[in-house]
Curated annotation (Swiss-Prot):
This is UDP-N-acetylglucosamine 1-carboxyvinyltransferase. It catalyses: phosphoenolpyruvate + UDP-N-acetyl-alpha-D-glucosamine = UDP-N-acetyl-3-O-(1-carboxyvinyl)-alpha-D-glucosamine + phosphate. Its main location: cytoplasm. Its EC number is 2.5.1.7. Keywords: Cell cycle, Cell division, Cell shape, Cell wall biogenesis/degradation, Cytoplasm, Peptidoglycan synthesis, Pyruvate, Transferase. It comes from Polynucleobacter necessarius subsp. necessarius (strain STIR1). One of its GO terms (biological process) is regulation of cell shape. InterPro entries: Enolpyruvate_Tfrase_dom, Enolpyruvate_Tfrase_sf, MurA_subfamily, RNA3'P_cycl/enolpyr_Trfase_a/b, UDP_GlcNAc_COvinyl_MurA. One of its GO terms (molecular function) is UDP-N-acetylglucosamine 1-carboxyvinyltransferase activity. Pathway: Cell wall biogenesis; peptidoglycan biosynthesis.
């Protein structure tokens, strides 16, 4: 099993190019199921989760071509022939985003059988809002033997437009219902919709495919169903979480980096907090020049839905707070059980206590290298940042979590001067 070994204490310096957004690529890949024509995608990140999704789509019947040898960011997907409407447990257990095939399969094939999802062990993340919305659109749904079995009755019928108010803001729920609604008969209104940029990116692709969607970027999406969608070309938006992770790394280690091919306008909440911590920034349309001198200042923050501070950046900024001057309170409102990295940070010498959904960090001057274990995707990134800032050698085990969401992270850090390597 791969591990990352690093020796901390080197300020980061140089340029880093951000990959496409994992959380946009996964629903966008599923959107190809809505049409029998080719969909051309660019800037798709080469991540374990993406490879898992591509394998699932191939099992369903999608053909996938990579026109440029050695370039997995550019692909052509063709779902002309759907040979199965099932996503098996073996495929879904490793990645909960597999649930995103449910809406497209139900909309186009009028039936779908999808295993209840797996993925990161950071909370229940139930799919009840997906089911509630699809039922409102006329689907008959049963949970049987660990599978969601959905169909329209009679099976030749399309889904029907409906007004849907979800009980909570759900990103994958919004995406599933949005995709399903594009081929429904009539108009669907999604109230309390997620406003994340990745949802907007999916909607932009669907519009290119012939969908009629208004309210993109707002919490109220109106979708006028069409009979058929066609092929399209689309480039996935840059990954704001990867960009934010590198910004946190330079705050923790010091130095000066330029984050290229990013979308600064999607990072407002993160940049505000990092500036509070002491980061100096110069921002262009698709780049951020970031420099840090001295010890960071502790910052309080609270996670919430976009445009507020993202839960996927909580662990990384907590690492900054672990070595900051002062004490801080970090409140997690999105997922329960998302403080599993705290125990590992404390192994490195951090002083962090948990009270309910709040972590209280007393900043220490230095962390000391140790062997630590990644517990989920973003926790693994936080431990890498901690290792880069710590004195001595740190080893992060179970790095497969990191590979699910970061494209060649250790190679990018090496180019910035970090002393880091992947070992077996």
């Amino acid at each position: 099993m791969d591990k990352l070994r690093m020796v901390g204490g080197t300020p980061l310096k140089g340029e880093v190019v951000i990959a496409g957004a994992k959380n946009a690529a996964l629903p966008i890949l599923c959107a190809c199921l809505l049409t029998d024509q080719p969909v051309v995608l660019r800037n798709v990140p080469d991540l374990q989760d993406v490879r898992t999704m591509l394998k699932l789509l191939q099992e369903i019947g999608v053909t996938i071509d990579f026109p440029s040898a050695g370039d997995r960011s550019y692909m052509v997907l063709n779902a002309a022939v759907i040979k199965s409407s099932e996503a098996t447990y073996e495929m879904v257990k490793t990645m909960r985003a597999s649930i995103l095939v449910l809406g497209p399969l139900l909309a186009r094939m009028h039936s779908a059988k999808v295993s209840l999802p797996g993925g990161c062990a950071i909370g229940a993340r139930p799919v009840d809002q997906h089911i509630k919305g699809l039922k409102a659109m006329g689907a008959t749904i049963k949970i049987k033997s660990g599978y969601i079995q959905a169909e329209t009755k009679p099976q030749s019928d399309r889904l029907k437009g409906a007004s849907i108010l979800t009980d909570m803001i759900t990103v994958t729920g919004t995406e599933n219902l949005l995709m399903a609604a594009t081929l429904a008969s009539g108009t669907t209104v999604l109230e309390n919709a997620a406003r994340e940029p990745e949802v907007g990116d999916l909607a932009e692709l669907l519009v290119k495919m012939g969908a009629k969607i208004s309210g993109i970027g707002s919490d109220r999406l109106v979708i006028e169903g069409v009979d058929k969608l066609h092929g399209a070309e689309h480039s996935v938006i840059p990954d704001r979480i990867e960009a934010g992770t590198f910004l946190c790394a330079v705050v923790a280690t010091g130095g000066e980096i330029t984050v290229k091919h990013c979308r600064p306008d999607t990072l407002d909440a993160v940049i505000v907090k990092l500036k509070e911590a002491g980061l100096q920034t110069e921002i262009g349309p698709d780049w951020i020049k970031a420099s840090m001198q001295g010890r960071p200042k502790a910052v309080n923050f609270r996670t919430s839905e976009y445009p507020a501070f993202p839960t996927d950046m909580q662990a990384q900024l907590m690492t900054v707070n672990a070595i900051a001057a002062g004490s801080s309170m970090i409140t997690e409102t999105i997922f329960e059980n998302r403080f599993m990295h705290v125990q590992e940070l404390n192994r490195l010498g951090a002083d962090i206590a948990i009270e309910g959904n709040t972590a209280i960090a007393q900043g220490v001057e230095k962390l000391s290298g140790a062997i630590v274990m990644a517990t989920d995707l973003r926790a693994s990134a936080s431990l890498v940042i901690a290792g880069l800032a710590a004195q001595g050698e740190t080893q992060v085990d179970r790095i497969y979590h990191l590979d699910r969401g970061y494209d060649r992270m250790e190679q990018k850090l090496t180019l910035l001067g970090a002393n880091i390597e992947r070992i077996k």
